[in-house]
């Protein structure tokens, strides 16, 4: 089913599902909260796709030890949701191979698949089966990148023809679900590989195929700096949705070639306005630093280190010059998009990478002026200013209503708040009151279903999109788990 049509139908249908008298809906209060009884909504054990002893252990521990029983119930449903419902694991050619769908869309996004398994990394050191599953994701992502570095989503069946083939003017190959060029699609696999290696010390996924994929990543980033030409990628779609197609013959609006990487689409899969997507370029900067750290520590890919260093330096310098702009209220802030000519947008989108999520994604190895993690750096102050702007009415996609408040975006439409943004707000906050506020918003957002949704209406949680969206579920679990370990009193 086409994603836009699916979103429209799911928002309209959600109220009908609840009105139809489901067990969960019957137990729901006016704000989406539940009474003393919490129905079983997690998929039956016999039908679960994958079981991790480490994940099950932490689920039991959290649910038993926190006072907020509704949050405990939500954690039990949400945290294992990726493993329960979206992974397809097997051994292929002697190597683990893991295909990860998003939930209700049977395709593997490079971004979502990385983000969906990321919250399990902290548990995989002592769970060999979980390690193998994540190794399988790393292997499959390398295969996908080598198939087409400009594609954002893939099928398991490499011969399957996408429904978008009939409408998309781009080089669509069999096995590709969608071919929207998004910088973050190539950053997330680096983040996952680096995180896995740091926690486990396991070198086995980083073989010749992975190195070939990393070479392709670097070459694609360099090509999309467009210093010499527009490059081989263009994209147009026959559609009534302007955000689903790219203007000017599919190459986007003009830019001044300053060293930033062009992105035709945002992580929401919506087209960019100005092709220099700043949060994605900052993510690329962190990813390049992580990649170089791995190459040097593992003594592999020595021919790639120089290219990665040159790109990192180029992107860093261009960001320092073009990413930070003066806002009339907040002072120096990060722009969301820019074009190198001085044009930029003041906004944020809920999808990650976002400006709000910069501390969540930034590499700890990066300590340059753009660091948002080190208080003595310029980037830290700029981020704090930006954060205040984003969480206010001065962000055109910050919505506030009777049911909650948070950042949305064009993808699900106006007045639709994405739980992803509330979760990221909580994960990046150092203020216990703000963390508690985010937990309460999320607790009240699930419309009695027991899971996070892609988005919900600011005035009515019963109007939501995508009832099965594994990324939001697992990320919610990560937020609860972090709070449990660092501020357990907030869960009482």
Regions found by a protein language model. Name each.
Residues 72-80, 117, 121, 131-145, ...:
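Hydrophobic core segments within long, regular secondary-structure runs in both alpha-
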């Amino acid at each position: 089913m086409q994603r836009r049509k699916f979103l429209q139908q799911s928002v309209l249908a959600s109220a009908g599902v609840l009105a139809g008298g489901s067990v969960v809906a019957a137990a729901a209060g006016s704000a989406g909260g539940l009474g003393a009884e919490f129905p079983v909504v997690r998929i039956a054990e016999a039908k679960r796709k994958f079981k991790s002893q480490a994940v099950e252990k932490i689920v039991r521990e959290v649910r038993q030890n926190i006072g907020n029983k509704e949050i405990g119930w939500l954690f039990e449903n949400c945290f294992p949701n990726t493993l329960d419902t979206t992974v397809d694991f097997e051994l292929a050619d002697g190597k683990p191979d893991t295909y990860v769908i998003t939930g209700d869309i049977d395709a593997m996004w490079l971004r979502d698949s990385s983000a969906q398994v990321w919250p399990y990394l902290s548990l995989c050191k002592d769970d060999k089966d979980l390690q193998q599953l994540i190794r399988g994701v790393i292997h499959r992502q390398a295969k996908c990148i080598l198939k087409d570095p400009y594609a954002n989503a893939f099928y398991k069946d490499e011969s399957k023809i996408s429904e978008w083939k009939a409408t998309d003017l781009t080089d669509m190959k069999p096995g590709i679900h969608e071919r929207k060029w998004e910088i973050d699609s190539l950053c997330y696999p680096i983040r996952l590989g680096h995180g896995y290696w740091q926690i486990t010390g396991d070198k086995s996924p980083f073989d010749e195929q992975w190195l070939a994929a990393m070479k392709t990543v670097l070459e694609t980033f360099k090509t999309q700096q467009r210093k010499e030409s527009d490059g081989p990628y263009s994209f147009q779609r026959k559609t009534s949705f302007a955000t689903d197609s790219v203007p000017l013959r599919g190459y986007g609006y003009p830019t001044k070639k300053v060293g930033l990487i062009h992105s035709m689409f945002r992580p929401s899969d919506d087209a960019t306005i100005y092709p220099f997507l700043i949060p994605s370029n900052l993510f690329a900067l962190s990813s390049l630093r992580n990649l170089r750290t791995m190459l040097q520590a593992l003594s592999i890919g020595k021919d790639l280190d120089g290219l990665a260093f040159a790109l990192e330096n180029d992107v860093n310098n261009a960001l320092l010059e073009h990413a930070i702009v003066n806002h009339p209220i907040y002072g120096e802030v990060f722009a969301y998009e820019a074009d190198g000519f001085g044009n930029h947008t003041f906004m944020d989108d809920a999808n990650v990478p976002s400006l709000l999520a910069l501390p969540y994604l930034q590499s700890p190895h990066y300590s340059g002026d753009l660091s948002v993690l080190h208080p003595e750096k310029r980037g830290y102050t700029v981020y704090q200013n930006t954060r205040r702007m984003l969480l206010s009415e001065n962000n055109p996609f910050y919505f506030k209503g009777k049911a909650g408040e948070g950042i949305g975006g064009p993808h699900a439409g106006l007045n639709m708040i994405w739980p992803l943004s509330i979760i990221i707000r909580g994960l990046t906050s150092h203020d216990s009151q703000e963390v508690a506020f985010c937990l309460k918003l999320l607790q009240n957002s699930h419309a009695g279903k027991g899971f996070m949704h892609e988005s919900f209406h600011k005035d009515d949680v019963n109007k939501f999109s995508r009832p099965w969206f594994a990324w939001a579920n697992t990320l919610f679990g990560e937020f609860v788990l972090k709070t449990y370990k660092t501020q357990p009193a907030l869960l009482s």
